[in-house]
C-alpha cells in the first residue's frame, strides 16, 4: 500500500460493492481487508452496528473473500519464485551434448516392434468393458448410491408405497409381485435373465448357440481353442505373448 493511500485496493473494492463513501473504513481504523477479518464475523457486526447496519455481514464476507484471494496469490508467487530459484541452480549441460544426437536416435520400429501387430480400432480404444458382465449402467448407479445404506430398492419402495400389499406378506401376491421380487434381488435386468434362461448345456448339437453368441457355425468348442479365432470372433485384442484359457468350461454355455 502506498504511503499516500489510506485504504488498500482490496478494501476499496469492498466499499464499492456495498455502496458506501470511499475512505469510510479508514475513519473506523480499517485500512485493509485483513483489519476486518482479524475479528470474527459476529464481532465485526456488533462493533459496527452504527454505520454499516444490516450490511455488516455482507461486508465481512466480502473482506474474507478478498483476503483469501490475496493469500492464494501470495502463496502462488512464493512458489513460483522458489521454482525459478531452483532452476537457476541447476547446471545446464546442453552445450556438452553430442552434436550428432539426431543420428543416434533410436527409431520407432526398433523401440516398438509390436506396433505393426496391434489392432488399433475404435472398439479396442474406446469400448469400456466392465469387470462384471453383464452390466446395466443405470442399475449400477442406483446400487452405488445405496451401497452405504445397506437397503434395497424393495425396502425403499415398500416404505413409500402403502398400496402394495405384496410387500406385507410373502403369501400375498398381486399384479406387481414379480416386480417386487426383482427389486429385492439386487440384480440388473440382464443379470436376472441368467438364472431364468433355458439350460442347453446338455444338448448334443450346440451349433445354434455358438453361431448366435460367437458368430461361428460349429457343433462344439474346438475351433475356439485357437487364440486368433477366439479373439477375432469376440472382437477383442490379446497382447503379444498373451494366452486365453478356452477349455471346455470356458466355451460351453453356462448351466
Swiss-Prot record:
Keyword Cell division among record annotations: no
Keyword Phosphoprotein among UniProt keywords: no
Keywords annotated in UniProt: Plasmid, Virulence
Ranges annotated as spanning the membrane: none
InterPro entries in alphabetical order: Insecticidal_toxin/plasmid_vir, Sal_SpvA
Assigned protein family: Belongs to the SpvA family.
NCBIfam families noted in UniProt: PRK15212.1 (NF011759)
Its biological purpose: Not known. This protein is involved in the virulence of salmonellas.
Protein name, per record: 28.1 kDa virulence protein
Source species: Salmonella typhimurium
Organism lineage string: Bacteria, Pseudomonadati, Pseudomonadota, Gammaproteobacteria, Enterobacterales
Gene: mkaB
Amino acid at each position: 500500500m502506498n504511503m499516500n493511500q489510506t485504504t488498500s485496493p482490496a478494501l476499496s473494492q469492498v466499499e464499492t460493492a456495498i455502496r458506501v463513501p470511499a475512505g469510510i473504513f479508514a475513519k473506523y481504523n480499517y485500512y485493509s481487508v485483513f483489519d476486518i477479518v482479524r475479528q470474527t464475523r459476529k464481532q465485526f457486526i456488533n462493533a459496527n452496528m452504527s454505520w454499516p447496519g444490516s450490511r455488516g455481514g455482507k461486508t465481512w464476507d466480502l473482506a474474507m473473500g478478498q483476503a483469501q484471494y490475496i493469500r492464494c496469490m501470495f502463496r502462488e508467487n512464493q512458489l513460483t519464485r522458489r521454482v525459478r530459484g531452483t532452476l537457476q541452480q541447476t547446471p545446464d549441460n546442453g552445450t556438452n551434448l553430442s552434436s550428432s544426437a539426431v543420428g543416434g536416435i533410436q527409431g520407432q520400429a526398433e523401440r516398438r516392434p509390436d506396433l505393426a501387430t496391434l489392432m488399433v480400432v475404435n472398439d479396442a480404444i474406446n469400448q469400456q468393458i466392465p469387470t462384471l458382465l453383464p452390466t446395466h449402467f443405470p442399475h449400477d448407479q442406483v446400487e452405488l448410491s445405496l451401497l452405504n445404506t445397506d437397503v434395497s430398492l424393495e425396502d425403499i419402495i415398500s416404505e413409500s408405497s402403502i398400496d402394495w400389499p405384496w410387500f406385507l406378506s410373502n403369501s400375498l401376491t398381486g399384479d406387481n409381485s414379480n416386480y417386487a421380487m426383482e427389486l429385492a434381488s439386487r440384480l440388473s435386468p440382464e443379470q436376472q435373465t441368467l438364472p431364468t434362461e433355458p439350460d442347453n448345456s446338455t444338448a448334443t448339437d450346440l451349433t445354434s448357440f455358438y453361431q448366435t453368441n460367437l458368430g461361428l457355425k460349429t457343433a462344439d468348442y474346438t475351433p475356439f481353442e485357437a487364440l486368433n479365432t477366439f479373439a477375432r470372433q469376440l472382437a477383442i485384442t490379446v497382447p503379444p505373448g498373451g494366452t486365453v484359457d478356452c477349455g471346455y468350461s470356458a466355451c460351453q454355455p453356462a448351466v
